[in-house]
């Protein structure tokens, strides 16, 4: 049974311009486990992100957390792009600083 991922993008701490923070992309509920998750800054892939170990829930759906350090400001736009067999094209979810 294939299941599409749920994608949530949020900062670890409330966003303040110029103050270092962590950007998280939490992807959950997907199956099969093969998935590609990228954090983007202004549409460009951020290198050197960290990824948790693949974990699964009791119902055998999987979840992953990808995160990186970042410093929010009003100029840059951040998002998370996910590629999975259930998605016809990559899903991109923007970070909303008020989330």
UniProtKB/Swiss-Prot annotation:
Subcellular location per the Swiss-Prot or TrEMBL entry: Secreted
SMART domains linked: IGc1 (SM00407)
Record InterPro entries: B2Microglobulin, Ig-like_dom, Ig-like_dom_sf, Ig-like_fold, Ig/MHC_CS, Ig_C1-set, MHC/Immunoglobulin
Record domain Ig-like C1-type: where: 5-92
Alphabetical keyword list: Disulfide bond, Immunity, Immunoglobulin domain, MHC I, Secreted
GO biological process, one term: immune response
Keyword flag Secreted: yes
Cellular component, GO annotation: extracellular region; MHC class I protein complex
Disulfide bonding pattern of the chain: 25-80
Domain of life, source organism: Eukaryota
A Pfam family that the UniProt record links to this protein: C1-set
Function recorded in the entry: Component of the class I major histocompatibility complex (MHC). Involved in the presentation of peptide antigens to the immune system.
PANTHER family in alphabetical order: BETA-2-MICROGLOBULIN, MHC CLASS II-RELATED
Subunit and partners: Heterodimer of an alpha chain and a beta chain. Beta-2-microglobulin is the beta-chain of major histocompatibility complex class I molecules.
Protein family (similarity comment): Belongs to the beta-2-microglobulin family.
UniProt-recorded name of the protein: Beta-2-microglobulin
Gene expressing this chain: B2M
């Amino acid at each position: 049974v294939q299941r599409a991922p749920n994608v949530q993008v949020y900062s670890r701490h409330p966003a303040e311009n110029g103050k270092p923070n962590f950007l998280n992309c939490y992807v959950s509920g997907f199956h099969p486990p093969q998935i590609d998750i990228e954090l983007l800054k202004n549409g460009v892939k951020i290198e050197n992100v960290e990824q948790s170990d693949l974990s699964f829930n009791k119902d055998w759906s999987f979840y992953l957390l990808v995160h990186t350090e970042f410093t929010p400001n009003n100029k840059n736009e951040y998002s998370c792009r996910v590629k999975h067999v259930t998605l016809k094209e990559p899903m991109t979810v923007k970070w909303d600083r008020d989330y």
